[in-house]
Amino acid sequence: WPESNDEPKLQGFAGYKVGMTHVIMIDDTKNSLTEGSEISVPVTVIETPAIRVAAIRAYGEDTYGEKAIGEAWTNVLDSDLDRRIKAPKNHDVNAALAKIEGLVEDGTVTDIRLITYTLPSSLTGVPKKVPDIMETGVSGADAKAKFEYAKNVLGTMVDVSDVFGNGGIIDVAAITTGHGTQGPVKRWGINLMKNKHSRQGSLRQVGTLGPWTPAHVSWRVPQMGQMGYHQRTEYNKRILKISSDADEINPAGGFTNYGLVRGNYILIKGSVPGPSKRLIRLREPTRSKVSSIGEPQIVHISTQSKQG
């Protein structure tokens, strides 16, 4: 998680991809040829229902590096969480908090993080009930302040508006769309065999696997194999809008392969990995010089049917 000296708050969130549309906005890019003019921008819609903070996890360091040294689980857990993990039973949350507080006081704790999970059962467009559970960082440099914040939000629901704001810069991580096993032409974009070579039984294959010596096929040679369904992170995406008014974005007939948005959502400039209904993880940027460019001025959001 990125280092931050801001006030303690969650550094990440999660949502489910809905689809794409486009908006008309005022170009606020400095020195752009269209600065101050209306431009059309493609956006991705991500539905972001509130997530619950399930536990506090404290980290300490020894000669082998950083490791977890204490956890405190809330007693306020949703029944759907049992579909994912076996939550601790007969857990004394007060004793666990007291233990972590003591470790914070003596300087043993180096970092405080939160265990959060989503509630996809509240979404009509995502056909699953099993929550997605994840560890989320907390901003701030003081472990004591981070622990006090963690105690306040333990067991509560956190909205996306409590974490990010309009115009903010974020990183997104997701599993890309899977294409199964594909050949080297589609997978790597190599050229087809030409002329006489194409009539000798190898039209969509690589010309050579390498030299005779060394007698080894390099990993650089484009070959067939799995294409897609990989975890990928894309950096420095801009949030254009955070809202709960779904009527502003729902197109006629709903989004393809998803349906209607009914709760909180965000609009991200450009595309994000993965198909609709897939989990999209959001976090504060790790490679950005600024955390926000400023709130964008959106003139129009397209609600034209996406059915074709």
Give residue ranges: language-model regions:
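Extended basic (Lys/Arg/His-rich) segments that typically form rRNA-contacting surfaces
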Residues: 1-177, 181, 186-308
